[in-house]
């Protein structure tokens, strides 16, 4: 059985809720704070591919950095969006949960149950 990995930010309430659900399940999992261990471009691209999502699908458009960089007005390629997300992790929706070949954006947190 594949182990579950949750990519999260400890101060995020949705991440904390998803982590609590994982703990309650009793299933083994690994929690990765992607601020301490940042995504590589290849890693994020692979996670998005497994999830069937594009970089824009996980973009946090209400973050100050989104506005500061003028991203709403930019027409970037997926590759350029990946570079932007890796450079500015605050722009990444969270948590991202991986189990083998399946990846989900666990919003709401209860959606993590799909992987249990």
Task: Locate predicted features.
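Thiol/selenol-based redox catalytic cores and closely related redox-interacting motifs
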Residues: 36-116
């Amino acid at each position: 059985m594949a182990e579950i990995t949750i990519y999260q930010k400890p101060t995020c309430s949705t991440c904390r809720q998803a982590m609590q659900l994982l703990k309650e399940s009793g299933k083994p999992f690994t929690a990765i704070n992607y601020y301490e261990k940042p995504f590589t471009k290849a890693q994020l691209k692979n996670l998005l591919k497994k999830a069937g999502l594009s970089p824009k699908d996980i973009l946090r458009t209400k973050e100050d950095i989104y506005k500061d960089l003028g991203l709403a007005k930019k027409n970037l390629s997926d590759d350029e969006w990946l570079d932007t997300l890796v450079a500015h992790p605050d722009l990444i929706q969270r948590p991202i949960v991986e189990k083998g070949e399946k990846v989900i954006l666990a919003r709401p947190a209860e959606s993590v149950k799909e992987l249990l």
